[in-house]
Amino acid sequence: MSVEAARRIVVAGVCAVGVIVVAACARVRYDPARATRPYPHHLHRAVAVDIQVFRDSETIEIVNSTARSYSDFDLWVNQRYVQHIAGLAPGQTIRLSLWDFYDERGEVINAGGFWRTEPPAPVRLVEIQPGPEQPMIGLIMIRE
């Protein structure tokens, strides 16, 4: 075996080990058991109520400035990720972790954080779905 052939084998082996190490360290951000239903696009409306949403790193803060309470609803983020919320009273503020929002495949939104290698996903649209076939209620997203 020539020196050149031996060098190629060593380089190929090092590359293979590198690929395996990188793949083994990658964290999968999905949980099939947490898979939800797809976003119901036919229920989307361009109407918003006076409920503000503020992003704070890996969480969102929702401030209900209305006199109306909302109970037992689904909160949608970016027309993809959803979390069920027990209630939001008039004047109430709630903080929710973005890591608790899942999509139809069980994937979680990339909320960011110190150890993340990718930039966090922006939160652009937040909506309340009061019931299974009820139209969406848009919230006011305050940009970061």
Residue map of PLM features:
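Sec-dependent bacterial lipoprotein signal peptides
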Residues: M1-R27
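Bacterial Sec signal peptide processing site at the extreme N-terminus
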Residues: V19-H42
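Terminal connector regions
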Residues: D31-R34, Y102-E144
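Cysteine-centric segments in proteins
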Residues: P38-V47, F54-R55, V108-P119
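Short, surface-exposed binding/anchoring microloops in extracellular/periplasmic proteins
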Residues: H41-A86
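A short, structured loop/turn motif at beta-sheet edges
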Residues: S65-R68, A89-P90, P130-E133
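A short, sequence-level motif marking secondary-structure junctions
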Residues: W76, L88-G91, I140-E144
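Intrinsically disordered, low-complexity Pro/Gly/Ser/Thr-rich segments with frequent PxxP/GP/PP motifs
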Residues: Q79-W115
